[in-house]
Amino acid sequence: MKEKTIIIVGGGQAAAMAAASLRQQGFTGELHLFSDERHLPYERPPLSKSMLLEDSPQLQQVLPANWWQENNVHLHSGVTIKTLGRDTRELVLTNGESWHWDQLFIATGAAARPLPLLDALGERCFTLRHAGDAARLREVLQPERSVVIVGAGTIGLELAASATQRRCKVTVIELAATVMGRNAPPPVQRYLLQRHQQAGVRILLNNAIEHVVDGEKVELTLQSGETLQADVVIYGIGISANEQLAREANLDTANGIVIDEACRTCDPAIFAGGDVAITRLDNGALHRCESWENANNQAQIAAAAMLGLPLPLLPPPWFWSDQYSDNLQFIGDMRGDDWLCRGNPETQKAIWFNLQNGVLIGAVTLNQGREIRPIRKWIQSGKTFDAKLLIDENIALKSL
């Protein structure tokens, strides 16, 4: 019997790891990856950090360059897909080529959620999703330039830190009442706000841009009535899933391709993962997880599901952020206001713990990354703790 053909659409983390996972899990059939980028699949997290800060930055490839040929994966880079061919099982490119598939994995990622008021500035306005975006930013983030960043989420704060380290004068505008309000607990939000302010970043909370005038400098009028002058304007206010191909194929979408917990779409032969995907939970709610690890996890899950293998167990959600000299790692459930702190954040070494009825459900480490491994095991096992012992620095965590 002829082996099936699997096509992967996308060129990022989830796409590359899906190819790797399929081969690792025993798939020996024909495997193709189609991407509109000309680079080999590369790591996205460094774009806001090392790609802006290192003297001679290089893209970090997800897989070694020789891996693709050695594992008989056909790479089609710099191509544009016209249609997925859901009914015909023939993917069609804009150049007229068509490629048969038996199963499809979509990992087309996401674009920056648009902000029309700033998009009208054209090339004077910047977002960060791809290597080319980082290269453009690197050129304009020069010492003493005034930089305005709209959005104080993870990407906004990482860019603020990098721009400050490049000796720019940075102002951050945030509509919400706090920084990283969507994915950090209150004590970590307070720490990060203070950390940036101490570094010289001006952070304007509960504020937004009302009017923009493009001149020698960009003039930004805020809701508060204040006017800012900027050499460089950057924004990061969320994502817009690259779901157009899926919509045109009549797959279920909701600012993301709707998948189940096996990464399967409404078509049993089509799977999706990474930032383009949004999971429908058992209770009907839709949940998106935008992280490097989630892309890896969903690639492994989709590969197993495509091959009819048992699905791997999901670890607790985890992501990290590097800002200035700080490494913060977030694991588990970030909800809730009652967090315990081990250590002193003022010394830039601390761990915040989230206990629910004594059970550890989440944690954030500040420059204590070596502790993530035991914490992950505790969260997975539902381990209970005495709060006083957990925050006592005289007691080694590994002894608890």
Swiss-Prot record:
Against InterPro entries, the record matches this protein to: FAD-oxidoreductase/Apoptosis (IPR050446), FAD/NAD-bd_sf (IPR036188), FAD/NAD-binding_dom (IPR023753), FAD/NAD-linked_Rdtase_dimer_sf (IPR016156), HcaD (IPR023744), Reductase_C (IPR028202), Ring-hydroxylating_dioxygenase (IPR053382)
Its cofactor is: FAD
The protein's name is 3-phenylpropionate/cinnamic acid dioxygenase ferredoxin--NAD(+) reductase component
Annotated GO molecular function terms are: 3-phenylpropionate dioxygenase activity; ferredoxin-NAD+ reductase activity; oxidoreductase activity, acting on NAD(P)H
Tell me the subunit arrangement: This dioxygenase system consists of four proteins: the two subunits of the hydroxylase component (HcaE and HcaF), a ferredoxin (HcaC) and a ferredoxin reductase (HcaD).
GO terms in the biological process aspect are:
3-phenylpropionate catabolic process
| Chain residues that bind FAD | 5-36
Q: Which HAMAP family match?
A: HcaD
The residues forming a coiled coil are none
At the top level, the lineage of the source is: Bacteria
| E.C. designation(s) | 1.18.1.3
Reaction(s) this enzyme catalyzes, per UniProt: 2 reduced [2Fe-2S]-[ferredoxin] + NAD(+) + H(+) = 2 oxidized [2Fe-2S]-[ferredoxin] + NADH
What Gene3D superfamilies is this protein classified in?
Answer: 3.30.390.30, FAD/NAD(P)-binding domain
Q: Enumerate the UniProt keywords alphabetically.
A: Aromatic hydrocarbons catabolism, FAD, Flavoprotein, NAD, Oxidoreductase
Q: Pathway of this protein?
A: Aromatic compound metabolism; 3-phenylpropanoate degradation
- List, alphabetically, the NCBIfam families matched: 3PPDioc_HcaD, PRK09754.1
Please report which protein family the annotation says this sequence is part of: Belongs to the bacterial ring-hydroxylating dioxygenase ferredoxin reductase family.
Q: Which organism is it from?
A: Escherichia coli (strain 55989 / EAEC)
What residues bind NAD(+), as annotated?
146-174
Per its database record, what is this protein's job?
Part of the multicomponent 3-phenylpropionate dioxygenase, that converts 3-phenylpropionic acid (PP) and cinnamic acid (CI) into 3-phenylpropionate-dihydrodiol (PP-dihydrodiol) and cinnamic acid-dihydrodiol (CI-dihydrodiol), respectively.
CC per GO annotation: cytoplasm
